[in-house]
Curated annotation (Swiss-Prot):
GO process terms (BP): photosynthesis
UniProt keyword annotation of Transcription present: no
Tagged with keyword Transmembrane: yes
Family: Belongs to the PsbN family.
Signal peptide: none
PANTHER family registered for this protein in UniProt: PROTEIN PSBN
Organism phylogeny: Eukaryota, Viridiplantae, Streptophyta, Embryophyta, Tracheophyta
Top-level taxon of origin: Eukaryota
Subcellular location: Plastid, Chloroplast thylakoid membrane
Name under which the protein is recorded: Protein PsbN
Species for this entry: Buxus microphylla
Topology of the protein relative to the lipid bilayer: Single-pass membrane protein
Transmembrane segments: 5-27
Length: 43
């Protein structure tokens, strides 16, 4: 394969992996440990 193709595939795969990890962290099991500053601030 050509070098440019491999670089494009690597960058695309990295972006997809990062996006998947970010969504898992935001909405998956680890999201239970995140704090919500709006709930901590009682009006």
């Amino acid at each position: 394969m050509e070098t440019a193709t491999l670089v494009a595939i690597f960058i695309s795969g990295s972006l997809v992996s990062f996006t998947g990890y970010a969504l898992y962290t935001a909405f998956g099991q680890p999201s239970q440990q995140l704090r919500d500053p709006f709930e901590e601030h009682g009006d």
